[in-house]
Amino acid sequence: MASNLSPAASASGASASPATRVKSATSTTSQFGYPRGHVGYLSADEEEALRSFQDVLEERGLYKRGPPASHDDQTLLRFLRARRWVVEDAFRQFKDTEDWRAANSIDTLYKTIQLDAYEQSRRLYPQWTGRRDRRGIPLYVFEIRTLDSKTISEYERLGSKSTFSQAKTDGKTPPGLLRLFALYENLTRFTQPFCTQLADREHPAVPITMSTNIVDIQGVGLTQFWNLKGHMQAASQLATAHYPETLDRIFIIGAPMFFSTVWGWIKRWFDPITVSKIFVLSAHEVKPTLEAFIDPCNIPKKYGGELDYTFGQLGVPDPHWEGVIDWEEGFTGFPTGPLLWEEVDDGKRVACVTYGSKGDEPRRQRICTLPKIWPATAAPEVDAENVAEGTATKTTSTAVTMTDVSEATQTAEPKAHDDGVQTDDAITNGDAVKKLQMHDEKHAEAANSAPPALATTVA
């Protein structure tokens, strides 16, 4: 399915059920992960931090207010969340990222990359299943065993010696890794904006800026982990530095007995916030935990769900897209390669357009269109005092109305290892969902303990 560049296989023949707003037990406004700290769900201090951040960036020539603004609020908020709302720290990371993007022509890389180079990267690294979790966040799967030392060596060799795009480089970022960042561009510029425009989610007025990830390490031996150490460390550190807060949770499946040794390396590649999002699940934890976050119809069969999806193939179209997406040119699913959304019909709809190059020919073909629902005409108002207490409440309804599905509430007393990783014995009696909920509440308490001066800027 993914080996050719023709339109993806057609969507499931099953009839589409009505779009409903589905709430998971771990995605309420009382918890730190989502949507707290996102557009429409900011406390007074967080609102002030965002305004101060915009002022600092504008004063230092890295931001223009527009309209349209040079950078949207949801992007700026990613850097603020990553740096715990300390504006000057967020500025330094933002500036480093902007400098890195300019020095490596990341926009040009994404728009001009050769399809075969893109496809080689796509097949090796985290892949969008075409589905979302219960909150509307895209679900990615990553099977580590595909990254053996021979494959990585060849991947880096071709990347360093081939002209796979029109982008320049800074000579510092390993050329063999640059293709990987076309995939991050696809996440932030295609998948997340697409999921933002889909209304069948719990908070349709909140733009999607994260991803949920299943990382499958079954069948990976200690030698393979060791051989991958350098490559994975470089890739992880660059991604953490320049694509902050694009991960919601990472569920590690199939961990071998020696994984605690491997974890000792891995946790040093990430900042503490990212580390806190990683959960290691034993075999009996996988199905109940994933189902708490993801509808079974969107979980691959390999992990106890109903989705006929195999790592390596293109994303499986969701029946809920029927009646929302208008496919064109014979397409019934999204093809491989760079994709971007562009406004059409006087801003009433958005169109998916292909980019990249096939041979010497640049691609530019319209795949589909769908209604533009975000940004909504009326943004939700939020009680800032309640947000600060972790109980945000909308006071104005959005333009989108959907059917509510009742929400479960659970509590539990967690155990945790000193190193912060959530492992089998940290999730007691198979009650992974309760453990995750308590983890979120603990995270929220830590965030609230930050000094009130966190929004103060440095001139």
Identify the function of each model-found stretch:
Residues A2-A459:
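Basic, amphipathic alpha-helical/coil surface patches used to engage anionic, phosphate-bearing ligands
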